[in-house]
UniProtKB/Swiss-Prot annotation:
One of its GO terms (molecular function) is UDP-N-acetylmuramate-L-alanine ligase activity. GO terms for biological process: cell division; cell wall organization; peptidoglycan biosynthetic process; regulation of cell shape. It is found in: Cytoplasm. This is UDP-N-acetylmuramate--L-alanine ligase. InterPro entries: Mur-like_cat_sf (IPR036565), Mur_ligase_C (IPR004101), Mur_ligase_C_dom_sf (IPR036615), Mur_ligase_cen (IPR013221), Mur_ligase_N (IPR000713), MurCDEF_pg_biosynth (IPR050061), UDP-N-AcMur_Ala_ligase_MurC (IPR005758). Keywords: ATP-binding, Cell cycle, Cell division, Cell shape, Cell wall biogenesis/degradation, Cytoplasm, Ligase, Nucleotide-binding, Peptidoglycan synthesis. It comes from Teredinibacter turnerae (strain ATCC 39867 / T7901). Cell wall formation.
Length: 473
């Protein structure tokens, strides 16, 4: 394999030492890893040690636990994310020392500037779609650089430096920082009301920002957009770039159809503007993943990747950590077994997609969900949607809201949400204050044949490994 160039970014020749504040985050760690592999001297800090920080340290990066002013001494630039408070001592010291401080997306934009960038945006499905594109491109011998918001199960990492000109990355709309990116291809999976504080609570502003992002494409660039999403279709007339649509709708350029579920796997066909329909096998359940795969096929076809590579890249895809990650089947002491699944989805639309995937693939099994709401503002803004979707499971254990740095909001906490769901009368939720109390509750309530899903974006992600280790004994 061709070795990637050291210092691939020509205009960053004056930069040697790069420090990441909050390096344990998925997006931050991926960029740090790519820059490290390009030969830059990378350091980073996070509030606590994690599997991610240990992995970065093992690669040779200097990783600090805790944020201290001295950590930025001698560095050339500091990278931070929107999750880092502006009063962070490292940011204050960097500005005091006149060290440039840039956002995560700005650094990603520099990585993309001199490459053929493929940026995947949208409220839901970014990580999986980005991963599927990277998988197809790798199978097609394109050897892409990729930066993904989750761990690729096949690679054990969320980023890699490839030798080709291709860079596949997520474009984060949560803080509007995706406007720093200037890709050649932009994918928009869907547009939903989320992170509305960034947009002043105005959905119109959110939509205009997506249009602005798409106009960062050069005039010869391509926007690949989901033709099933009504918000997206309403914006297409405003996009002064080539648009390729995908979805289940008849008028989409890339149309998925004839979907057949096979116990967590699925087969379907994709009609394309030219050539024969493409037969696809996907090792993941859910119609949302059919859409994600169809977006990846649209991008790959437009970039000239052959059909065999597309089919094999999808068939061999091993999934992404915490995206409907199946831990396996576990026997119960009383006989029978349960299947354990972990999923990152934390918006009502994402939770609904997970539930539908289970219902479609395992229609005769009981769905037992352990859900942790993420952010008080999201719980407040989408309260009724959460009540409706969570009422559709068979057994519900509800945790307190994972604050993610927010202050509690009266009426938007886990206990209040649990009461409202109980009042609707479709499911009787069990509220558990702390995550450490969940295994005992699950053990008492579980029944043979259950599919247990740990769901959410907070520390509920640590629960599935705990349950798997205890084996429900």
């Amino acid at each position: 394999m061709q070795q990637p160039d050291i210092h691939f970014i020509p205009e960053m020749r004056r930069i040697r030492r790069i420090h990441f504040v909050g390096v344990g985050g998925a997006g931050m760690s991926g960029i740090a890893e790519v820059l490290h592999n390009q030969g830059y001297l990378i350091s980073g800090s996070d509030l606590r040690e994690s599997d991610v920080t240990r992995r970065l340290s093992a690669m040779g990066m200097t990783i600090y636990v805790g944020h201290h002013a001295k950590n930025v001494h001698g560095v050339d630039v500091v990278v931070n994310s929107s999750a880092v408070d502006e009063a962070n001592p490292e940011l204050l010291e960097a500005r005091q020392q006149r060290i440039p401080v840039v956002r995560r997306a700005e650094m990603l934009g520099e990585l993309m500037r001199y490459r053929h960038g493929i940026a995947v945006a949208g409220t839901h499905g970014k990580t999986t779609t980005t991963s599927l594109i990277a998988s197809i491109f790798a199978e097609g011998d394109k050897d892409p650089t990729f930066v993904i918001g989750g761990l690729l199960n096949s690679a054990g990492t969320n980023a890699a430096l490839g030798a080709s000109r291709y860079l596949v990355a997520e474009a984060d709309e949560s803080d509007a920082s995706f406007l720093h990116l200037q890709p050649m291809v932009a994918v928009v999976t869907n547009i939903d009301a989320d992170h509305m504080d960034t947009y002043g609570g105005d959905f119109g502003t959110l939509k205009k920002t997506f249009v602005e992002f798409l106009h960062n494409l050069p005039f010869y660039g391509v926007a690949v957009m989901c033709g099933d999403d009504p918000v997206i279709t309403s914006l297409i007339p405003d996009i002064a770039r080539t648009v390729i649509t995908y979805g289940f709708s008849e008028d989409c350029d890339f149309k998925a159809y004839d979907v057949k579920q096979e116990s967590g796997k699925q087969r379907f066909k994709i009609k394309r503007p030219e050539g024969e329909p493409l037969d696809i096998y996907l090792n993941m359940p859910g119609q949302h993943n059919v859409l994600n795969a169809t977006a990846a096929v649209a991008v790959a076809t437009d970039e000239g990747i052959d059909d065999i590579a597309i089919q094999q890249g999808l068939a061999q895809f091993m999934g992404v950590g915490r995206r409907f990650q199946i831990y396996g089947d576990y026997p119960l002491p009383q006989g029978g077994s349960v299947m354990l699944v972990d999923d990152y989805g934390h918006h009502p639309r994402e939770v609904a997609a997970t539930i539908r995937a289970v219902r479609d693939s395992w229609p005769d099994r009981r769905l037992f969900m352990v859900y942790q709401p993420h952010r008080y503002t999201r719980t407040r803004d989408l309260y009724e949607d959460f009540v409706e979707v969570l009422s559709s499971v068979d057994q519900l254990v509800l945790l307190e809201v994972y604050a993610a740095g927010e202050e509690p909001i009266p009426g938007a906490d886990g206990r209040h949400l649990s009461r409202t769901i109980r009042t609707r009368g479709l499911v009787d939720p069990i509220f558990v204050e702390g995550i450490e109390g969940v295994p005992a509750v699950v053990k008492d309530l579980v029944k043979p044949g259950d599919i247990i899903i740990t769901q959410g974006a907070g520390n509920v992600g640590s629960l599935a490994p705990t349950l798997a280790k205890k084996k429900f004994a």
